Amino acid sequence: MNQLPEKLLAKGNEAIAMAAIDSGCLLYFGYPITPQNDIPEYLSKHLPALGGQFIQAESEIASINLLLGASSTGARAMTSSSSPGISLMQEGISYLAGSELPGLIVNISRSGPGLGGISPSQGDYFQATRGGGHGDYRMIVLAPSTVQEMYDLTCLAFDLSDKYRNPAMILGDALIGQMKEPLIRQTCKKMDLPPKDWALRGAEGRKPNRIKSLYLQDGELSEHNWKLYEKYEQMKKEEVRFETFYAEGAKLIIAAFGSMARVSKTSMEMAREEGMKVGLFRPITIFPFPQKALFALSQKVKPFLTVELNTGQMVEDVKLSVDRDAQVYFYGRPPGSLPSPDEVLEEIKKVYGIEHSA
């Protein structure tokens, strides 16, 4: 490994793989699928030289269960896939959450439903933010919009996952995963984390640890689920992250995440050059969603335009978050093509004209 910090040109997928190594993750389990294959390719070359393990499993189902086993020993471990592969992992992710085990899952999402295609999509928002598998659980979900954030948020995701003993997800897409941008690779900032005294590392001289998600005694499962609920509420209080641009004094706020936040930011700048007071609200954590921040903003600014690379998913969280008097408009593009900044600008003009005409 080169001496850090190091400035280089890298793909978003490669940035995730580098951050995993720099976060102390030496265990990777996965199965190939486009457009995330740069992640396992990079790690297959570098992990063995660092004393780590790279395992190409026979399926995504096997991959997530290998992650569960590795995590139960207290090791940092990860997997990555793309939309249909993530769907195959849902049972295992539910078991991770139910067993209170950390672990990083990366979804470089692609078009669906079904086999779909390999173009970028934000159609996995509901699956990521609502749990996805069976049972009443949530994942920590971070949504990068740059290659640098692919690196930085991967470092953060490992720490948050360990802090809360809960699976975390990086929700990217084919655009950010495949694009190249300047990247500053540096030592990951690490939280002060508690020891993993729950891990299965042998029981000489102490009572054995047990990791499970099966609770059959009267009231036991209910108590466990309330414990998980309190953990998710703590995440909402402590881990919300978002970014705003020109929100102060704006007369229209665009809400967008990930790759569409990039497009929307350019459209916002074009609109401002034409004299329109337009701002941008970008959630970085999509679970926990920045509900309170959006509500506070909606008391000053109305209306909102939610822009997504799907037919309408995050817009539901925006509507639930804003003041009841705030109008929320939606502009979406089904997977298969990416809207240009000019196309989003036309929608901005349309909404701005409706709301601010004489």
Task: Cite the ranges covered by each PLM segment.
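Conserved thiamine diphosphate
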Residues: 120-173, 356
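Thiamine diphosphate
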Residues: 1-131, 138, 146, 334, ...
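Glycine-/acidic-rich phosphate or pyrophosphate-binding loops and their flanking alpha/beta elements
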Residues: 11-15, 229-252, 265
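Peripheral docking tails and interdomain loops at the edges
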Residues: 308-358
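Short, solvent-exposed amphipathic alpha-helical segments in soluble enzyme
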Residues: 44-46, 94-97, 155-160, 185-188, ...
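Conformationally flexible catalytic loops at phosphate/diphosphate-handling active centers
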Residues: 165-244
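Redox- and metal-dependent alpha/beta enzyme cores, enriched for Fe-S-associated oxidoreductases
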Residues: 242-276, 281, 287-293
